[in-house]
């Protein structure tokens, strides 16, 4: 069945039993493959819940702009979720962030502001 909305795929990731990581035969280890989220990260779930909860509480509404300091996967996930929910987002990153991260955030529609790396994220 094809999902109606990509947001419905977040957290709906496979659970796999690991047979080689645990030596104790009385232990059953299950691994949740969060890398199978639409954005490829465990951060997708957190980003979705932060934005969806803020919308539900009325803390933000469509048309508002979110501003977040980030250095990686959370920013990518926030950019993706904001785009899917039609919310503008501005992400502040240190200038030494990888080109791939900043390009991905921009590809999702985020405005990316780079700050001097030596000062960190302010």
PLM features per residue range, with description:
Residues 1-122:
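PLP-dependent amino-acid enzyme catalytic core
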């Amino acid at each position: 069945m094809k999902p109606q909305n990509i947001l419905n795929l977040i957290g709906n990731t496979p659970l796999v039993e690991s047979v080689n990581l645990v030596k104790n035969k009385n232990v059953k280890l299950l691994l949740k493959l969060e890398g199978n989220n639409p954005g490829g990260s465990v951060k997708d779930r957190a980003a979705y819940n932060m934005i969806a909860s803020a919308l539900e509480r009325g803390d933000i509404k469509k048309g508002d702009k979110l501003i977040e300091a980030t250095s990686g996967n959370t920013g990518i996930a926030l950019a993706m979720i904001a785009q899917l929910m039609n919310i503008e987002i501005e992400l502040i990153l240190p200038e030494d962030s990888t080109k791939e991260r900043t390009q991905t955030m921009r590809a999702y529609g985020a405005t990316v502001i780079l700050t001097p790396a030596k000062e960190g994220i302010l």
